[in-house]
Amino acid sequence: AQSSDEDVVTAEYIGNDATPDTASFHIAVKQLATEQINQGNYLQPDRYQFTPGIYSFDLNTNTNSYEFQFSVDRKDSNADVQQKLMQLINHSKIGLNASMDQNGKGENALVLSSSQTGIADDEDYLFQILPDASPSSMLALKLLGINQIAQEAGNSSFGLNGKDHSSYSYSFMV
């Protein structure tokens, strides 16, 4: 199996026969599958906008629900709080990657992206973040803004021998 443009599509024969069928396929990639990305608010790193205390929020996927708790000390700056959350999410190993984005003003935003790409027709999101019912957790989540979806998950879209197809990921079998 071979591709005429390995930068766009790779082909691999995985059949049982040592000589693959001689049929050829024409694939036209229209759109790659995308992950969900939530981007938080940009905060000034050296400000202290979080009141000391213990906060929590729920992170829901289509199959599981997780509760995250974090504490804020009086010496924790905005950057410290964002860093704590980034490490908390990355160490949880639940299929999300947390990173920090910095704008031209030097402000930081927490960015969460799903490892999974694509989404089923009956799903609205790959993950959703909701605050604890306490007013302080609601305020902290509003300040962080990590519940805001910046990019929805999307399926790949491609034509195979003139017929439209889609897939949750970058790979499929014919």
Give the ranges of each region predicted by the language model.
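Bacterial flagellar/type III secretion structural subunits and associated motility module proteins
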Residues: A1-E107, S113-V174
